[in-house]
Amino acid sequence: MPDENYYIYYPYQSDMTGKTAASTGATLTDAEFYAPLIDSWQPRKDQSSYEAYAASDLMTANGSVENGTDNSLTLTFSMAHRMALAVVELPAFVYRFTNQHSIPDYVFSSPTEFDSEALPYLVSDGTCRYLFHPSAGMELSAYNDSRQCEFSIEIQPNQIAGGSYRLYKPNGGRVMKLHTLQVGDFFLADGHLLPYDADNEKVQTSNVVGIVFQTNPARIGDAEKKVLGGEVHALVMALKNAAVDVTFWITRPVESYLPACSSKAEGYNDISGYWNSEQMRKACGDFSSYPALKAADEYNKYYPVPATTTGWYLPSSGQCWDLLQYLGGCPALADPAEQTSDALGYDERLGQGDVPAALNKWMAKIADKDKHTFTSDDNIWTSTWSRSSVHNWAIYAGGVFCRYLYSAIDYESMIVRPVLAF
């Protein structure tokens, strides 16, 4: 109707008494009509949930009217934000990989906690957002997991107009580095990477916790991919054993909670130690009856890693296969005929060179106190099941031996060497 005006606002308020301007006979804009509401609006201090953030986002509109068919009217509203918005690009490090085969960017940052009264809404794109009244300004401060100040932002009153936003990049925001991801690269406790050919001093002054042994996404399990949000980059071997001379189980179960892998191909294709471990945890409640799984899991207490990883776990037989192929230099394990064979996986491969020495070579730059070297006749537990037994890889000077152990007794040195995916 020509003499009528239509106004809307969001979010809904149960009491709008005194929140709209008195009629003067003149046509008012929505900003003028809702001036008392806008002036008195107080965004929530804690906007850390989407619901709280949305409830703080005052919007208004003045409707336009169009005549439709059959004497109908069409009302159109275009909502305008009335609060000011601070968008903060959280400090993060981005590795952009230059490998020939495509590997997604690896993004990580220290956990950020806010200690200001203002608590922003964290968005999945690596930013946080906070709405505030333009006339009030705001202060936002955060610290990292070392309890050190990460950043502090102060916005003065009327510095940002209502309906506007400003992007802040404390500490430079996202920092990008080009890197060619390779087997042998060093993985650090804070999530950073060092190239495999970094000099000794750089390696020994960095907090290295693992060695990259697989960079092919096709050889990383679906469970690892799922827990990492669908994007994976590599597998990493720990520098130390989680346990030595430990059994896989205390009392051998009558049946397994895992699928049986008996052939070479089945062992090679079992590439998700994370799934195996979590399946056992789900079925049994905990790892109290499975010392090898428990040792790998508890390794996370002593050598914590960022949330951008799976955390440490017991590798599967296929992951151990890759570890021995790429770090151990075993030519038989690189043979496609072996990888696709239906023959029994319980098999000794001779003529593979000094496998422990080959593995240790990748850790040569690591200080002795920060690593456990491999020795001849080490037996590496895996989480792969074979009917009533568990896959175990023996390594020695001259070859490797994939055994199926039917009992929990020791065979030479039974070790747990955890892995992780990132």
Question: Which residue stretches match the model-derived regions?
Answer:
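Short, low-hydrophobicity acidic/polar segments
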Residues: 1-85, 93, 161, 169-170
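Tryptophan-paired
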Residues: 1-24, 95-172
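Residues within well-ordered beta-strands of beta-sheet-rich folds
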Residues: 7-9, 85-89, 236-238, 313, ...
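Loop/turn elements at helix/coil->beta-strand transitions in domains of secreted/extracellular proteins
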Residues: 232-234, 307-312, 318, 377
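C-terminal, surface-exposed recognition/capping segments
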Residues: 318-422
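Outer/extracellular conduits and scaffolds centered on Gram-negative outer-membrane beta-barrels
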Residues: 82-84, 315, 321-322
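Low-complexity, serine/threonine/proline-enriched polar segments
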Residues: 37-56, 252-288, 292, 343-370
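Short, compositionally biased
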Residues: 141-146, 154-308, 409-422
